[in-house]
């Protein structure tokens, strides 16, 4: 249900265009969710949840989780207008050889919601953050279905 609502929020964000961005003097999403301390706590919980999630933890078996947690913080801080610069690789390059499925991407999304719940970020703010991340799915997921019917348009991918 949360995933559906997250997708619904994405549509609302895309339709609303720049309405998701803070105007002059308005607090940013970064500030609204609680700033650095809250976001760092959420990313720490997120990594802990991922580590214990048998649906996806194998993907991170050879990952430096401290560095990964920092990259997550930078990325989330950046997209929520916290003033951070993301120093990691782009999503397509970082995930190119991992063969991540839609099911694994959805599991990661569920884990993110759980992390946000654990640090008491309100659900409406969770949806705003997830909506900002949702466009990355195309660069991360590698099991896009391609129809065998030549009359059906096939995704071009990257």
Indicate residue ranges for each PLM-predicted region.
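Core of compact, soluble alpha-helical bundle domains
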Residues: 21-158
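Positively charged n-region of N-terminal signal peptides that target proteins for export
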Residues: 1-4
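Bacterial N-terminal signal peptides
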Residues: 6-17
């Amino acid at each position: 249900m949360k995933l559906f609502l997250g997708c619904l929020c994405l549509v609302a964000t895309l339709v609303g265009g720049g309405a998701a961005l803070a105007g002059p003097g308005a607090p940013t999403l970064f500030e609204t969710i609680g700033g650095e301390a809250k976001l760092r706590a959420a990313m720490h919980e997120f990594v802990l949840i991922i580590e214990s999630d048998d649906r996806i933890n194998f993907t991170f078996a050879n990952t430096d989780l401290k560095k990964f947690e920092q990259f997550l913080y930078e990325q989330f801080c950046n997209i929520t207008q916290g003033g951070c610069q993301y120093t990691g690789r782009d999503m397509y390059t970082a995930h190119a050889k991992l063969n991540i499925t839609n099911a694994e991407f959805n599991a990661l999304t569920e884990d993110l919601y759980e992390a946000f719940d654990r640090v008491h970020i309100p659900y409406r703010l969770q949806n705003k953050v997830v909506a900002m991340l949702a466009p990355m799915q195309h660069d991360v997921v590698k099991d896009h279905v391609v129809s065998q019917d030549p009359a059906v348009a096939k995704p071009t991918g990257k």
